[in-house]
Amino acid sequence: MERLIPKLIGLYLNLLAVVAPSKAASIGFFLFCRPLRSKLAAHHHAFFDSAEKFCFESGGETIQAYRWGRGPKNVLLVHGWQSHAFRWKKYVEAFDKSRYSVYAIDAPGHGLSTGKTMTVPLYSQAVETLLGRVGELHAAIGHSVGGFTAVY
């Protein structure tokens, strides 16, 4: 059933696009901006517990942020749609924590951040707020919409 519903929604949007493309686009965008929040398992929390965790406010939501390492070079990891900071686990483990401070956030409506809506401008605002706290970046790495957000 979990796989059937997205397929039915896709079929509906494809059929609607034939007769009412603007309406199909509007509904598609509405759905895209409301991600399904995935459940966090014990191994996700164990990884998050290995970080220095902190929260900040952005766009009316509480954003969960993480920091690994205390190095002088700041790196930001920006996840994609319907994901959370755990997706960066292997990357975080690969960084030399004496040389890098590795930051990640859970986007609005994702992971441990609050909210039900996520758009690139909202996500970008959260990234900008974080950068106001941590300062200049050495690098940013993004996946999918996270990559778009990092350069928005």
Residue ranges and their predicted role:
Residues I141-G142, G146-A150:
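Gly/Ala-rich beta-loop-alpha elbow adjacent to hydrolase catalytic centers
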Residues T117-H138:
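Alpha/beta-hydrolase active-site loop
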Residues A85, V92-T114:
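Conserved alpha/beta-hydrolase
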